[in-house]
Amino acid sequence: SFGVSQLPDDILQVYKPLLKRFNKILIREVTGKTLLHTQLGLDSQVVLDPTFLLSRSQWEKMANYPLSKQQKYILSFQIINRDVHYDAMLDYLHRKLGYEVIELKDSFRYKPWKWPIYAKAGPKEFLGLIKNAEMVVTNSFHATVFSILFHRSFFCSRNSFGFNSRMENLTGGLGLADRMFDSSTFLHSISDTDVVYEKVDEILEAKISATKQIIEKTFAK
């Protein structure tokens, strides 16, 4: 996975001889497949991120729930610095839905603390916080993945650094392109806060089946 749609020339010179050593390349985004073909002349196949190859119930068994299951909250998790419009967007969702906002961060050093911060989450708590949220707002690929697996309402914020392609491919490929937004225009472009997962699950099940077949065929050789 590259996370971008184009690589600079200096990186290409490093990647090309190394990638040519592989018999087969599997990649988790369509833009990555295009990048490999157009910039490096290499063929690849698109598969799902491995997290999708475990079922929802398998992930649920691993989850810990650090907050009360009765508590209703919007979970905010940003792995890349937010822009100036992000807090206004969270405030809008807080007022619209009436739920508290919980910020998932790696420490308490972030200031000002507009919302309550949860800074003690390991992998199990990460799963539980997403599973129990009424809504997830994030720019994290895997927070998006688990929001989908756990059937959470969610929004993905684009970042100004350009690392958006893998989330755009993920949401677009599942019919969830309207979940992607720019925080500067969010208030003017917000779609329904709920996600209808029936169709999403149909698409996802087909992609999971195809991914497993590709992996099995690859390792059978």
Give the residues covered by each predicted segment:
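Active-site anion-handling motifs in enzyme catalytic cores
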Residues: S1-K221
